């Protein structure tokens, strides 16, 4: 054989070996979450969604094994989340970043995603600006403006509420929620009579709730992050005699998720909320999801759970489209525009913003067959993130 032919044959053989080796290497997914601290339960629920999806669909996609590497931020701690993201990319050589029960940590990790060109799936981070921080970030949760503006408009047009007071946590998602609830409410004819913000870390809600009580509002819109804070705020309302059957209390879903309702008991009855998911949502897809989740984890799923479940669905389907290619450009191109039927209902990854377009459900807490649950009373379909939709 001539030298040139030998060289070509050697090159082809080398490329073939390299291709086979790459095909056999696992795709590494680094999950950053608050596995300890005040938001530990939210991280666990999100991670349960990840685990359930992988149990149902296996750990191999497009001929490549998936390897999950979990890291605890102990947060919310953006600096730690950013360091963990850097370590996952540089030391552990992950292909995909995922997780993020809190927005501050998702925003910090997005800088690493942008710099390293790594695909990143936010399974819960709700700050609207998140997807603008990196062209490789895709969201499978929701944005606070998405639910808050929808709730504000509904309250003024269908809820019979004309005046309200707002109280939110003083960080990105809370400020988003305040601004866009007020926009939806005022544009639909409602009046804001006062606003107050509470700190993110270990807040004492008492003085803020007292200010609201002194204003004697017809209704209140609140946002606090998930975890232990919703029940603590609800108890502060009760301690000061604010009764949701007399003064309408409205919120996004965190304030009336199952954990909060367990902490509040009958104090939760009558509360109104807007959210994209609740385990009590009636559909065959969700009933199957809840049954499987209960069997595996002996508890009900929440919106953190469905965010993790749908986040893994997005990763699996994107990898199928790329036939196992896990670079950021290939995966984000495969993910944008993707549509599927989730336990929450129909989902679309907006091809322009990489946010979720989905149904927002208006719910009221009621006692049904002896159980205190959220009951869907209305829905708003095909809701986009209004921050980007208005630009």
Task: Identify the residue ranges that each predicted region occupies.
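Extracytosolic ligand-binding ectodomains
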Residues: 2-9, 19, 23-391
């Amino acid at each position: 054989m001539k030298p040139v032919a030998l060289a070509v044959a050697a090159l082809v053989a080398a490329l073939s070996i390299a291709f086979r080796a790459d095909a056999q290497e696992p795709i590494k997914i680094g999950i950053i979450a608050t596995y300890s601290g005040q938001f530990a339960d939210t991280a666990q629920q999100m991670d349960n969604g990840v685990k359930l999806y992988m149990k149902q669909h296996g750990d191999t996609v497009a001929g490549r094994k998936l390897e999950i590497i979990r890291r605890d931020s102990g947060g919310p701690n953006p600096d730690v989340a950013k360091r963990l993201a850097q370590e996952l990319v540089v030391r552990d050589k992950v292909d995909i970043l995922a997780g993020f029960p809190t927005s501050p940590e998702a925003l910090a990790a997005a800088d690493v995603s942008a710099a390293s060109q790594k695909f990143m799936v936010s399974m819960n981070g709700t700050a609207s600006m998140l997807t603008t921080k990196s062209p490789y970030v895709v969201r499978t949760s929701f944005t606070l403006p998405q639910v808050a503006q929808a709730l504000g408009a509904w309250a003024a047009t269908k809820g019979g509420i004309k005046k309200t007071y707002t109280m939110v946590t003083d960080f990105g998602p809370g400020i988003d929620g305040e601004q866009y609830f007020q926009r939806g409410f005022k544009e639909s004819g409602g009046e804001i009579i006062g606003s107050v913000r509470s700190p993110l870390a270990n807040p004492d809600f008492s003085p803020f709730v007292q200010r609201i009580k002194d204003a004697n509002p017809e209704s209140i819109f609140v946002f606090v992050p998930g975890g232990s804070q919703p029940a603590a705020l609800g108890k502060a309302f009760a301690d000061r005699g604010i009764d949701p059957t007399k003064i309408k209390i409205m919120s996004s879903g965190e304030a009336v998720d199952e954990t909060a309702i367990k902490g509040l008991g009958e104090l939760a009855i009558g509360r109104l909320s807007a959210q994209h998911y609740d385990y009590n949502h009636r559909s065959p897809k969700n009933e199957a999801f809840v049954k499987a989740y209960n069997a595996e984890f002996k508890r009900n799923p929440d919106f953190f759970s469905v965010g993790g479940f749908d986040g893994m669905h997005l990763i699996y389907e994107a990898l199928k489209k790329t036939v196992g290619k896990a670079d950021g450009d290939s995966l984000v191109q495969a993910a944008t525009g993707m549509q599927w039927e989730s336990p929450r209902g129909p989902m679309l990854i907006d091809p322009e913003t990489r946010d979720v377009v989905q149904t927002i459900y208006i719910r009221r807490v009621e006692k049904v067959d002896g159980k205190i649950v959220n009951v869907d009373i209305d829905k708003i379909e095909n809701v986009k993130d209004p921050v980007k939709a208005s630009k």
